[in-house]
Amino acid sequence: GQSVLVTGAGGSIGSELCRQILALRPTTLLLLDHSEFNLYSILSELEQRIARESLPVRLLPILGSDRNPEKLLDVMKTWRVDTVYHAAAYKHVPMVEHNIAEGVLNNVIGTLNTAQAALQAGVANFVLISTDKAVRPTNVMGSTKRLAELTLQALSHEVAPVLFGDMGNVSRVNKTRFTMVRFGNVLGSS
């Protein structure tokens, strides 16, 4: 029984991850999303399934963003998260082209915030949901996802990582395994 956190839990990829993870019966499934409506929708669906199938899983909806590192760390420590699936991202190519700064903040800085919180909380596994557009990127969205991947690769190679915002001598041992998956175009994703 693991404690699992899914960021972007209300999105098309995040919500499907939640459905699949539920079948594996984690002790706790934490759903984090910045959209109240999307979070409510996936929560309601999963609660119905838990009741119907008598699953021994605790669901926790967390309204929040990967741009809030303090909240991420608090959630991961409080619920002793074992695995993070980081699906929160802006993924619409034209939208990110027109909103470059927001794309960078969400896809790159949000990933950095989530990864650093995982390191600080001693999370065992961190899985980044990436995209095939990160391979030799030709657009801003693909570039932001590639930067997110490179960020995790850099953190994974550090035995004793120094995190952004660390003050003084902070001794930390990297206990987090970082992995990433690249999806192609996903049928039915918004």
Tell me the role of every PLM-derived stretch.
Residues 22-24, 54-57, 94-98, 174-180:
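Gly-rich Lys/Arg/Thr-decorated short loops/hinges at beta-loop-alpha junctions or inter-strand turns
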Residues 86, 90-150, 154-168, 178:
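Conserved Rossmann-fold NAD(P)-dependent oxidoreductase catalytic core, especially the SDR/UDP-sugar
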Residues 17, 42-44, 72-75, 95-98, ...:
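Short acidic, glycine/serine/threonine-rich loops at helix termini
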Residues 1-82:
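N-terminal Rossmann/SDR dinucleotide-binding element
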Residues 61-63, 128, 180:
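Conserved beta-strand scaffold in the Rossmann-like NAD(H)/NADP(H)-binding core
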Residues 11, 37, 70, 112, ...:
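Feature representing long, continuous alpha-helical segments
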Residues 110, 188-190:
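Substrate-positioning beta->alpha
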Residues 67, 134, 186-188:
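Conserved sequence/active-site signature of Rossmann-fold short-chain dehydrogenase/reductase
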